[in-house]
C-alpha cells in the first residue's frame, strides 16, 4: 500500500515555499510516498500567487496541490492581528476534514501523517478524529523555536513576559549560548496587544505533536538543536535543511535575465545586494538615508526597492512607478555606472552570482539560509517577526554577519517606524561588509558554512540522515 502525507502550510511565501520544497524532497527520497499540499487563500497578497501558479503549470509527480476554497475575508479581518493567520485555517476546517476523511477511506493509500505549519497546529484536532498523527513544521530556526518554548514555559509559570518589553534585561535561553537581550525578542511575544497568550497556546499544542521538523541543519545551529533534544517536554526534533527554492518563485523571467545580465558585467565579489523581503518597504526619509549611505560607500550595488502596500489595498507592490520621486535628486545619474535600483529580485539567483560579495538583509529565516547556501556574508537590518532574533544569532552566535541594526523594529501591520538609521552608519557597515580582505573572519566562516550546508543535504550528511530517521518514524 502506498503512503500519503498531507501538508498544510500557512499562506505566506516564507512558509509555503519551504513546505512545498520539503514535499518535493520527501518524494525524491521515498519512492512509495506521495504528498498532498492543501493551500489556503489569504485575503491579502502574501507573495504566493505566482509560486502557486508555477506549481500548477510545472507539476511534480506524486505531488498534488489542492487549493482550498476562498472564504469571506470578513471571517477573520476583524480578528486581533496575532490571530489572523491561525484564524484562516479555522475557516477551512470543514474542507480539511472532508479531504482527510476521503483520503483515509482509500483502499490503495494509507495516510501516514499530517504535517502542519506551526501557525496551523490546531488542525491537530481534526487529524486526531481520523487517528492521523500530526507533525509540525517550524519555518524559523532552532534558536527561535527554543526561545518560544522557553517564553511559553515562563508564561505557564505565571511570569509576565511582557515585562521584558523595552527593558535592558538579558535572558538566559537554553537554545542560545549567549544571553539574549530583551531588545531582540520578537515583539509578538512580549506585547500585551500582540496576542502572546494565544501564540504560546500554539507552542503548547506543538508539545503534543509527534515530531517537529525544522528548516535548519546541525552544523549551523548545533547548540540550539542539542538544547531542544535535551528537553524531555519537547517532541523529537528533525533538522532537515537547508530546504530552499533554488529555481525561483515564478516571477518574471525577463526581468530576472536583465538583472543577472547586469551582474555579469560586474567584477567578482564587488556588488552589495540590498533586499528586505516581500514586506520590506521604508518611509521616504529612510530610503534617502540608504541611498546616501550607498553612494558614499563607493561600492557597486543592486538594490531591491519596493513600496509598501497602499492604504486600503491588499496587493503587494513589486516596484515604484517613478524612482526619482523617492530617491535623492540626481542619485540615479550619479550612481548609474556602479549601481542598479530594481523592484522585485530573483534573490537566490542574485546571491549565487559570483559578482555579489555582500547582502544587506532583513534576516528572514529563508534569506538567512539562502545567504549561507551561497556563501555571502550579511549586514543585518531586521524589521519584524523573529528577524531581530535571527540577526542576533547571525552576529553573536554564529559570527557570519555584521550588524547595522539588530533591534530595528517595524510595525508589521502599520509599516511605520520613527527610528531612522543614518547614512553614516550604513556607509560604515557596508564598507565593513565589503572590505577586500581574504582572511576576513566573517567571510571565512560564511564560506565554511556554505560547504557545510551542502554537505548536510548530501548522502550521509546530517540533514540527509535526519530525514532518513524521520521516514522511519513516519512510515
From Swiss-Prot:
Keywords (A to Z) from UniProt: Glycosyltransferase, Isoprene biosynthesis, Transferase
EC numbers, comma separated: 2.4.1.363
Gene3D superfamilies the record matches: Glycogen Phosphorylase B
Effect of residue 13 to F: Reduced ability to transfer a glucose residue to the C20-OH of protopanaxatriol (PPT)
SUPFAM superfamilies: UDP-Glycosyltransferase/glycogen phosphorylase
Catalytic activity: (20S)-protopanaxadiol + UDP-alpha-D-glucose = (20S)-ginsenoside C-K + UDP + H(+); (20S)-ginsenoside Rg3 + UDP-alpha-D-glucose = (20S)-ginsenoside Rd + UDP + H(+); (20S)-ginsenoside Rh2 + UDP-alpha-D-glucose = (20S)-ginsenoside F2 + UDP + H(+); (20S)-protopanaxatriol + UDP-alpha-D-glucose = (20S)-ginsenoside F1 + UDP + H(+)
Site residues (Essential for the glycosylation activity toward the C20-OH of protopanaxatriol (PPT)), renumbered to this chain: 144
Residues involved in UDP-alpha-D-glucose binding: 345, 347, 362, 365-367, 370, 386-387
Role played: Component of the dammarane-type triterpene saponins (e.g. ginsenosides or panaxosides) biosynthetic pathway. Glycosyltransferase that catalyzes the biosynthesis of ginsenoside F1 from protopanaxatriol (PPT). Triggers C20-OH glycosylation of ginsenoside Rg3 to produce ginsenoside Rd. Mediates the conversion of protopanaxadiol (PPD) to the ginsenoside compound K. catalyzes the production of 20S-O-beta-(D-glucosyl)-dammarenediol II form dammarenediol II (DM).
Protein family membership: Belongs to the UDP-glycosyltransferase family.
Name recorded for this polypeptide: UDP-glycosyltransferase 1
Native source species: Panax ginseng (Korean ginseng)
Amino acid at each position: 500500500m502506498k503512503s500519503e502525507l498531507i501538508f498544510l502550510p500557512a499562506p505566506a511565501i516564507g512558509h509555503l515555499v519551504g513546505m512545498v520544497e520539503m514535499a518535493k524532497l520527501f518524494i525524491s527520497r521515498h519512492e512509495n510516498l506521495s504528498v498532498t499540499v492543501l493551500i489556503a487563500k489569504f485575503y491579502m497578497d502574501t507573495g504566493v500567487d505566482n509560486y502557486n501558479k508555477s506549481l500548477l503549470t510545472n507539476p511534480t509527480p506524486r505531488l498534488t496541490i489542492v487549493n482550498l476554497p476562498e472564504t469571506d475575508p470578513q471571517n477573520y479581518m476583524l480578528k486581533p492581528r496575532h490571530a489572523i493567520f491561525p484564524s484562516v485555517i479555522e475557516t477551512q476546517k470543514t474542507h480539511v476534514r472532508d479531504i482527510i476523511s476521503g483520503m483515509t477511506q482509500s483502499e490503495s493509500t494509507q495516510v501516514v501523517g499530517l504535517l502542519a505549519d506551526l501557525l496551523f497546529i490546531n488542525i491537530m484536532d481534526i487529524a486526531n478524529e481520523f487517528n492521523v498523527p500530526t507533525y509540525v513544521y517550524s519555518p524559523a530556526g532552532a534558536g527561535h523555536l527554543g526561545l518560544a518554548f522557553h517564553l511559553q514555559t515562563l508564561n505557564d509559570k505565571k511570569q509576565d513576559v511582557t515585562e521584558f518589553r523595552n527593558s535592558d534585561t538579558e535572558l538566559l535561553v537554553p537554545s542560545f549560548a549567549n544571553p539574549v537581550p530583551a531588545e531582540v525578542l520578537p515583539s509578538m511575544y512580549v506585547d500585551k496587544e500582540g496576542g502572546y497568550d494565544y501564540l504560546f497556546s500554539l507552542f503548547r499544542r506543538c508539545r503534543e505533536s509527534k515530531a517537529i521538523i525544522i528548516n535548519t541543519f546541525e552544523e549551523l545551529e548545533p547548540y540550539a538543536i542539542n538544547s531542544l533534544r535535551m528537553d524531555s517536554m519537547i517532541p523529537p526534533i528533525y533538522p532537515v535543511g537547508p530546504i530552499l527554492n533554488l529555481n525561483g518563485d515564478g516571477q518574471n523571467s525577463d526581468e530576472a535575465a536583465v538583472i543577472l545580465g547586469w551582474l555579469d558585467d560586474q567584477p567578482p565579489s564587488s556588488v552589495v545586494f540590498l533586499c528586505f523581503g516581500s514586506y520590506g518597504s521604508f518611509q521616504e526619509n529612510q530610503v534617502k538615508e540608504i541611498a546616501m549611505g550607498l553612494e558614499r560607500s563607493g561600492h557597486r550595488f543592486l538594490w531591491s526597492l519596493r513600496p509598501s502596500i497602499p492604504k486600503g489595498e491588499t496587493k503587494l507592490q513589486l516596484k515604484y512607478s517613478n524612482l526619482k520621486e523617492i530617491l535623492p535628486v540626481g542619485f540615479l545619474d550619479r550612481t548609474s555606472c556602479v549601481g542598479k535600483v530594481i523592484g522585485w529580485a530573483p534573490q537566490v539567483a542574485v546571491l549565487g552570482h559570483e559578482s555579489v560579495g555582500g547582502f544587506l538583509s532583513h534576516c528572514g529565516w529563508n534569506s538567512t539560509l539562502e545567504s549561507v547556501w551561497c556563501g555571502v556574508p550579511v549586514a543585518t537590518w531586521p524589521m519584524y517577526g523573529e528577524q531581530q532574533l535571527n540577526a542576533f544569532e547571525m552576529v553573536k552566535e554564529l559570527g557570519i554577519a555584521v550588524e547595522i541594526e539588530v533591534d530595528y523594529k517595524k510595525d508589521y501591520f502599520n509599516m511605520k517606524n520613527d527610528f531612522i538609521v543614518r547614512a553614516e552608519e550604513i556607509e560604515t557597515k557596508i564598507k565593513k561588509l565589503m572590505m577586500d580582505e581574504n582572511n576576513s573572519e566573517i567571510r571565512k566562516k560564511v564560506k565554511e558554512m556554505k560547504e557545510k550546508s551542502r554537505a548536510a543535504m548530501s548522502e550521509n550528511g546530517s540533514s540527509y540522515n535526519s530525514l532518513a530517521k524521520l521516514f522511519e518514524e513516519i512510515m
